[in-house]
Amino acid sequence: MQIDLSQIYSGVDQLYANQPQMPSYAPGRSIVTSVYSAELATGYVLMCELARLGNKLPVEVFYRDGELSQQQIDLLTSPDPSKITVKKIRGNAKDFTTIYGTKAGWSVKVHAIYESSYDEILWLDSDSFPITNPEFLFNDPEYVSKGSLFWRDVTSVDRSNRYYDQAPLWQVFRVQPNDGEPFEAGQLLINKSKCWMQFSLVKHYADNCEYYYHFGGDTETFRMAWQHHEARRNGYYSYINYHASNLVPYGFIPYGPFHKGVPNQYGKWGGGTVMVQRDRVGCELFNHRNINKFKLSGNVYNNDITNEWHYHQHVKQLNTLLEVNKW
C-alpha cells in the first residue's frame, strides 16, 4: 500500500504533544498472555506449566469478544484458579491483513498489555513455555535500570530486504538505520510506568497497524518505538552501537535463540520447529513452539525438548476434561 509519510509522522507528533495519560495500574507484577479458541490446547499447556513450575504471580489471560466460550475460559483457569484470570479485551484490537490476504490479530498482544492490571508485566505468547519459573527476570539488572527486557529473533536471508539503509522500515518509523538486532516478542518484560511513552508509541502503532505491521507484525514495533523515542530525546542523527554501547535504551538478552525439535518445513530459521530462547548466562529459558503449536491431537513429540513429556501430559489431561464434561 502507499503510505503518506507526512500523515503518519503527524500522528506520532500529535501523540507526543498530547502525552497520553497512563491508566492507574496496581503496583506489582503479573504474567500476561492471550488465547483464542484455536489455541486452546497451547494456552492450557502454558497455564499448566506456570502452575507446575511454581509461579506465584497473577496470570492475566486476554481474549477478544467471541474468541473463547465460557467452558474454554473455565478450562484455562482450572490449573490454578487462585492466580489465573481470563479477561475480555475492551479496546479495539484490530486485525491486520497480510500480503497473503489472511487476518492476523497481532494487536491483541499490545491491547492485553495495555489493559493488564499491574504496572510491571512479563508477556508470554501462549506458545512460549518457560523451562523454569521466570519470575526471576523481574530482578534482571538491565530490566531494573531500563524498565524493559527483550530477546533477539532468528533471521534468514529472505528478511534482509527489510534492513538495508534505504528500506521503508526506517522511513515509516522515523529511525536512522542501525545495527540493532530484530526482536522476537514471544516474551518480553515492560515496566509501564518507567517506559510509558515508549509503550504508548507501541500502542499507537497497533491502533494504526495498517501502516506499521508490514515489517513482521507487532514484533518490530517494540524495537522501533524504543529507538524512535531515544532519537527524539538525543537527536535523530545520534549514533548508538547497539552491540556494545551502554546507551542502548532497552534491556536486551545477550544470547540469541537456537532451534530444536523436528525439522521445520521451510528448511530455515535454524532448521527446527521449537525456538529456544536463553537467559542472561546462556541457559535455556523458553521453548517457543511457534511452528508446530499444540492441538488436541496429532502433536509431534520432540525428544530433545526440555519438559516435552509434561507438555503432552497436559494435552492428555485437557482431552480427559473435555470428554468428562462433554465440552
Show which residues each predicted segment covers:
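A glycosyltransferase accessory/donor-loop signature
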Residues: M1-V35, E39, P177-W327
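Short, charged/polar "capping" segments at the starts of alpha-helices
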Residues: L40-A41, G66-I73, D158-R159
